[in-house]
Regions:
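FIC/Doc superfamily catalytic core
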Residues: 1-154, 158-207
Length: 207
């Protein structure tokens, strides 16, 4: 594949991926509108926030892609916070900062832990993940546990899916795009992990 073909492949992927990941979180831009926004156009009657969510998610994906192409290293807290910082680039007071208030997860019965426990829980999660060689199963479980913790005030879903793709691509696989049309299956898989610690259903979405 030529460099131009590779760039076109990722351009097409990031448009659909950005649309789906943002739509899962409530962004109302259509796929075509997302494509136009990523080309620098403004969509009439759509809020600035939704435009920024699109461009910032794209930028976060290309940051992740750069990490994959760079010197291999284990997942760490600094990388997670940097990905989140790009996703929430328009909110300097919140980006890359663990939340300091209670939150609820859209579409989930699980109640995230008290914010005071987040630094410890994230440290333990990262230590657990890096304690063995990564696999798709381990990536899926990391994602489920990350979403349970819900460490940030906003952007947890988008950030969590970007982290999953970082780790998937580090294994040599193509990035995964969980479709907006499959959001119920995605939420159900997360809820199933909350209730049973069974990750197979979620793992199938990362293939």
């Amino acid at each position: 594949m030529t460099q131009g073909e590779l760039e076109r492949k990722y351009e097409d992927f990031v448009t659909e991926y950005t649309y789906n990941s943002n739509a899962i979180e409530g962004n109302t831009l259509t796929l075509r509108e997302t494509a136009l926004v990523l080309r620098g156009l403004t969509i009439d009657k759509k809020p600035l926030k939704e435009h920024l969510e699109a461009t910032q998610h794209r930028d976060a994906f290309y940051y992740v892609l750069g990490l994959v192409k760079g010197t291999p290293r284990k997942l760490d807290e600094a990388t997670i916070k940097q990905i989140h910082s790009i996703v929430l680039n328009d909110r300097p007071e919140d980006r890359g900062v663990y939340r300091k208030m209670p939150v609820r997860i859209m579409g989930a019965s699980h109640i995230p832990p008290n914010w005071a426990k987040i630094p410890t829980l994230m440290h333990e999660l990262i230590e657990w993940y890096n304690s063995e060689k990564p696999t798709r199963t381990r990536i899926a479980e990391f994602h489920a546990r990350f979403e349970q913790i819900h460490p940030f005030i906003d952007g947890n879903g988008r950030t969590g899916r970007l982290i999953a793709n970082l780790e998937i691509m580090k294994l040599g696989f193509e990035p995964v795009d969980i479709k907006f049309a499959n959001r119920k299956e995605y939420y159900d898989a997360l809820n199933e992990y909350d209730e049973t610690k069974e990750v197979k259903r979620l793992e199938t979405l990362f293939i």
